[in-house]
A protein has these predicted regions:
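Conserved active-site-proximal phosphate/metal-binding subdomains
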Residues: 1-137
Length: 137
């Protein structure tokens, strides 16, 4: 905040927690990731997003995940005939642990988690890091 920020996004740090209801397989993507595993992808409506690279993302790049129909109609601007994949199916599959048919969005530091923690542990670490950084300023 001292550098002029008015807010931060910190969702990724809470994914590999005991309280997160995502599957263990989904959480393992965060725990096993390296910095180079995170890349910018394009959503079916052309919006960029940061995600972990994986089999599904590579299949999308090769044109292997094109939808044949659209049972959901979740995004008005999404044209399934031009879309490289169905985002709702990909995110649903990933949340359920089927990472071969889905992917996980990620923050820039999402690869830093090394184990599943409780939210309480995450908050305590954030507080400790904050006070340490404040002392160094």
């Amino acid at each position: 905040m001292a550098l002029g920020a008015s807010a931060v996004q910190m969702g990724s740090i809470f994914v590999p927690t005991e309280e997160c209801d995502a599957s263990v397989e989904f959480k393992k993507v965060y725990l096993n990731a390296h910095r180079e595993d995170i890349r910018i992808i394009q959503s079916p409506v052309g919006m960029p997003g940061r995600a972990f690279d994986g089999e599904f993302i590579r299949n999308v790049a090769e044109g292997k995940e094109k939808p044949r129909s659209c049972p959901f109609h979740c995004i008005k601007t999404c044209d399934y005939t031009k879309s490289p994949y169905c985002i709702i199916k990909a995110l649903y599959n990933a949340a359920r642990g089927n990472m071969k048919k889905g992917y996980a969005f990620a923050g820039g530091n999402a690869y830093l988690s090394d184990r599943i923690r409780s939210v309480k542990e995450v908050i305590e670490k954030l507080k400790a890091d904050f006070f340490l950084s404040k002392a160094l300023l």
